[in-house]
């Protein structure tokens, strides 16, 4: 039987970058708190956690790319909130941010985790940022730790 690989939830020694959208900050600040909570619980020191604020979700992939290619981080976590309005803007932004974040990870060969809420309403976004549906920021940071460790095991 061949080898089986998995990542562990031990963040000791990992360096993590968080890219956070300032737009809808009343939501994204909760995502950031959740992400920091997960990192701390799993042993990532505060000194090894950097935060880059961007104006909106659309700017997340560019800054994530710069951080991912810097060689300073084991993973990049992307946090934002895109809430549907009455125009097609939601579809354009959600689609491009999703594709951009995925492309950054593939191009950099680094875990670049999608922690962007795409919601039909403010209520849905609030639920996913720490109330009924858990905290997507916490989940994304946890995924970053696991995949960063998995990537180390694969080399």
From Swiss-Prot:
Keywords: Riboflavin biosynthesis, Transferase. GO terms for biological process: riboflavin biosynthetic process. Coiled coil: none annotated. It catalyses: (2S)-2-hydroxy-3-oxobutyl phosphate + 5-amino-6-(D-ribitylamino)uracil = 6,7-dimethyl-8-(1-D-ribityl)lumazine + phosphate + 2 H2O + H(+). 5-amino-6-(D-ribitylamino)uracil binds at residues 23, 57-59, 81-83, 114. GO terms for cellular component: cytosol; riboflavin synthase complex. (2S)-2-hydroxy-3-oxobutyl phosphate binds at residues 86-87, 128. Catalyzes the formation of 6,7-dimethyl-8-ribityllumazine by condensation of 5-amino-6-(D-ribitylamino)uracil with 3,4-dihydroxy-2-butanone 4-phosphate. This is the penultimate step in the biosynthesis of riboflavin. This is 6,7-dimethyl-8-ribityllumazine synthase. It comes from Dehalococcoides mccartyi (strain ATCC BAA-2100 / JCM 16839 / KCTC 5957 / BAV1). The gene is ribH.
């Amino acid at each position: 039987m061949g080898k089986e690989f998995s990542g562990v939830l031990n963040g000791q020694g990992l360096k993590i970058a968080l890219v956070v959208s300032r737009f809808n900050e009343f939501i994204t600040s909760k995502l950031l708190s959740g992400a920091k909570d997960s990192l701390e619980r799993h042993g990532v020191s505060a000194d090894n956690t950097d935060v880059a604020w961007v104006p909106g979700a659309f700017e997340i992939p560019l800054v994530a790319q710069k951080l991912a290619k810097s060689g300073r981080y084991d993973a990049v976590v992307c946090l934002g909130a895109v809430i549907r309005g009455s125009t097609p803007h939601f579809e354009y932004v959600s689609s491009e941010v999703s594709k951009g974040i995925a492309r950054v990870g593939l191009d950099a060969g680094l875990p670049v985790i999608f922690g962007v809420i795409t919601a039909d309403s403010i209520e849905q976004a609030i639920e996913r940022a720490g109330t009924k549906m858990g905290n997507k920021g916490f989940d994304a940071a946890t995924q970053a730790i696991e995949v960063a460790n998995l990537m180390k095991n694969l080399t």
